[in-house]
Amino acid sequence: MAKLSGKTAVVTGSTSGIGLAYARAFAGAGANIVLNGMGAPADIEKERSGIETDFKVKCVHSPADMTKPAEIAEMVALGENTFGSVDILVNNAGIQFVSPIEDFPIEKWDAIIAINLSSAFHGIRAAVPHMKKKGWGRIINTASAHSLVASPFKAAYVAAKHGIAGLTKTVALEVATNKITCNCISPGYVWTPLVEKQIPDTMKA
């Protein structure tokens, strides 16, 4: 299957979990990939080279920090400069912290909003001009069931995911006439390193 041959997908938070699954799915459809995320260098290289070997596409890794707008712009530019286009952007990076609201650390709030919400804005802002130039683009934002409902002790995460839903709708209206779509996916629990830390031992049994 090579429906996306010649196209480039930039996927944030893609060195493990849902993001890596996105990246491998797009590679399986023929797209070149810009991976992004943290991890041990050897582990990242294993995933990067594995994508190239398994799917016969090109794959590079951007270490862009999702709290830094300039680095996010550089990540998008890496796709354009390396592969000639940025056709697909997946905003998937995310972190979590659980605490009662009165004890919620300010720095944790700021970090979650920056990574889970603001990074998507910065990525979209950087990618849309490339997509408009080509007259085609796909933007996918990973929201959550928490973009639809609330959950106690997750004030920042729930606020960010509700924000992702609103951002998605707004961008979709703005870019539709340019043959660019913007959608979000709202999964529930998916067994990833992020979620595993949240599941009580009683639920694992």
Regions found by a protein language model. Give the residues of each.
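Conserved glycine-rich cofactor-binding loop
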Residues: 8, 15-16
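Conserved glycine-rich Rossmann-like NAD(P)H-binding loop of the short-chain dehydrogenase/reductase
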Residues: 29-46
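Substrate-binding pocket helix/loop in short-chain dehydrogenase/reductase
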Residues: 100-101, 108-113, 203
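Active-site loop immediately N-terminal to the catalytic Tyr-X3-Lys motif
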Residues: 102, 149-156, 177-178
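Active-site helix of classical SDR
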Residues: 124, 160, 168
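Alpha-helical segment proximal to the catalytic Tyr-Lys
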Residues: 129, 173-174
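Residue(s) in the substrate-gating loop at a strand-loop-helix junction
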Residues: 144
